[in-house]
Structure formats: C-alpha cells, structure tokens
Amino acid sequence: MNWYGLLVLFHFCLSLSIALRIIYSRRSSSAALAWLTVLFAFPLLGVIVYLLIGESKLGRARAQRQAELLAFHDAFADRFLPPQTVPLCEVRFRQIAHLVQADSGYVATGGNTTRLLTDTDAILQAFVADIEAARHCCLLEFYIVEGTGRVEAVLEALMRAAGRGVRCQLLADALGSSSFWRSSWPQRLRAAGVEVTEALPVGLLKSLWVRSDLRNHRKILIVDYRVAYTGSYNLVDPRLFKQKAGVGEWVDAVLRCEGAVAQELAAVFYGDWAVENEHNLSATLEQLTGYVDEMPQGAPETPGGALLQVIPSQPGSDMALVYDVLCNALNVAQERVVISTPYFVPDEALLNTLILTAKRGVEVVLILPKRVDSRLVRYASRAYYQPLLAAGVQLRMFDGGLLHTKAVVIDGRFALFGTVNMDMRSFYLNLEVSLAVFTPETVTAISALLDGYLAGSEAVELKKWQQRRRVQRFIERCVRLVSPLL
C-alpha cells in the first residue's frame, strides 16, 4: 500500500473513531447530528474542526482546578454568607431556587437592594462613584474591556483606588478583550498597583489541547463585598465599540445590587481568579477572612429587600443549569413570558418548550435586535421564526441599535437577568452568570425595561414572513443544520 492509501486509511479510521465518540457522548442529539453532518460532508476539514472545537477541552490542569471550585464555594458560604433560609416566594418559583442550590450550591439571599441601570452614562457614573468610595477591594471581571472613550474614567478611578491601598483586581477575557491586551492599559494599570489577569489565554499550540473558543463571558463588578453589578454590559463605550459592524450602538442594562448577593458574586469572581492564577484556594479563603475581619459590619438586610440567587455556569460539565432553569420557568408560566436576547439559536427542546408554552394560552413575546453582528447567527435565528409564529409566539424586532440585554420575565413575578444568550454556546460552553430574581418589585423594573424595548420594536407577521424569497429560506435551512454548533 502506498502513502496515499495509508493516509486514506488513517483518515477513515480517525473519522470513524470520532463518529463513534460523537454517538456515545452525552451531547444533545441535535448537536451530535450536526457534528456528524460536518464530519462526513467535509471529510478532512470536518476532522480538523472537530479536533479543535468539538469538545469542551479545558486542559487537564484547568479541569482539575475547576473540580476544586465546588468545595471552595461551600467553604466560602460557610464563612461569609448568611444562613440559608427558605425562599419567600411562590411555590412554583421556590422549586427553581431549590434546583439552583442543588446543582450549584448557591442559595437565594434576601434583603438586597437593587437599582436597574439602562443608560451607559448612568452605568459608568455608578461604576466610578462606587470605585471612588471603595475602602477594601474592587473586583472586575468582563468579557470585553476597551479602554477608550468614557471607559477611561473607570480605569483611571481603579488606578486611584489602588493608590489608596484598595486591592483592585481585573480579570478580562483573552479573546474578547484582545484590543485591551494589545494596548498600553495593562502595563499602566499594573504600574498603578492594579492586579490584571488574562482569562482563558489563547495560542496556536494551546488550541491543540485546550478549546480556544471557550470564553469567559461574565460581566461582574464588586466593591467591598457590599455592592455588585452584573448584566449584559461589557466595559466598552458603545459610541466607539464596533461602529463599523453596521448594527448601531449596543443597548445594555445592568443591575446594581447591595447586600449578600454581592458576596455570592465575589465567590464566582474568586473562583475564576484562582483558576487563572493557580492561586491556592485555601490561601484565598484565609486572605478573605483577614479582609472581612478588618471591615466594619455592613448594613443589616433591608426588610422586604430583593430575593436574588446567583446562577453561574461553565464548561466541563454535562449539566446546563441556566438552560434547565429557563425551561422550568417556561413550564410554570401561566400568563405572560417576555424574553430579550441578542442571539437566538435554540435547540429542539427549547424551541418546543416555547411553542408549547404559547399553545397552552400563555402570551409569549420574543424581542430580538433587527440587526446583529453575526451573519451566521442571523440566518440561523430566522430558521426558527416560522414555527414560533405559527404557534402564536409574538416576534418583535428592535430597531434602536443592537439590543444586547439578556432577560426573561415570567408572569411579572420572576425574572432571569444576566449574561446568557439564548444559544447553545451560552448554555453549554461559556463561563456565564445570571441572577434569578424572585421579588416582584425588581421584576417589575425589568419588565418595564422590556416593555420599553417593545415600544421601539416592530412585529413580524406570519403571512409576510412566509413570502420571503426562496433563496433566503434555503440559506436559513442550510445554516440550521449546524446551528447547534454556533
């Protein structure tokens, strides 16, 4: 047998072994079929692509480190978090709280005060004000950081805080914040005393054993373990960010929280920080104990304050906690569901859950941006419009920029708010964080925000949608075949 024959045989054996691995893996059937399609439709390319991004490869050291995080959180909760109480909310939503606690260890905490920020100027001014008032620590974790425009004020406030002796730590994703890492900002921040770390570093050789498209998509800012922010907002100036993409300014929202939930989000941050820096988690706990002992007692829980629960998610697990929570919330909806997401690429199970929710008489409203910055995602999303519209789901296209807010409101009494898009990448691959909101007052604020988006949106009509060109339908259906991989 010549060399060509040996190569063909090797390729066949490798493809067969990969196909068997796909079939016997615990991934969804739609994702498995999509990978098999890519593998055999593009013989050599399919093998290469699968070896690079086909599995949630964290690397051995990182995977072992991730396994330590659950014990770290348990110890963190025992030392720093208030005692667990039964969530005071409706039984149907209390069951969601129990699900999150059982799978993640994070409990619902009451007595928090919240403020929803929906304007970039208000968000950045609040960031700067809290950093300027910091006495002990400033913890920042973002997918995208760009030190331009109005963001410069935040980074400068961080440097001033470090100069006052406040411990300031910034964790930014290597790929999402690539322009930040190429700039002079990391050096300037470190020179001022700010600890700066790259999350999930990428490299040509590294991608052979660590999947390079697994990203840290979290957006968190914590000050003195007392105040915390999370939501869809990256640390960028929308007036300058991706202006050549033709989608307009990004539209985001952030929830400012004060109370025990800030300590829960601190646990998420410190776990990520320790993994990236190979810090000893026990030493981190001891260090935190010293900080907390030196801090004055915080304000007591606000009577009737917001009941919130942190829902972290990360790769390297067969579970998709946020996905499970979302499906459970849809299943217990009785009156109205409103969803805002920039990227909508559901799997068959989530699609069917949305359809069945609408068919049983619940008003289901899905708000999407009219223009997105990914052509593949745009075509993949459109492939799902017709079955949703036929089932009675209301589709609204927001035309005031790229709507980037990720929120779900159920019956005006429960909400999910955070960083998670409605696609399999967010559910299964990225490091994400969401808040489950159980208090009607905070849910009402989020609901009012989504109603404001609805006022600036136009409806998609089924009859008009069915009249689109055949070539568009063909492209949408082709892209849908690989949509579980997007």
Predicted regions and their residues:
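N-terminal localization/anchoring segments of enzymes in phospholipid and broader phosphate metabolism
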Residues: 1-324, 328, 332, 372, ...
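Helical hairpin unit composed of two closely spaced alpha helices linked by a short loop
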Residues: 343-365, 369, 374
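Short, solvent-exposed amphipathic alpha-helical segments in soluble enzyme
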Residues: 353-357, 383, 452
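CN hydrolase (nitrilase-like) catalytic-core segments centered on the catalytic cysteine
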Residues: 380, 392
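Active-site donor-binding acidic/aromatic loop of nucleotide-activated sugar
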Residues: 395-399
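Catalytic-core elements of nucleic-acid end-processing and repair enzymes
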Residues: 406
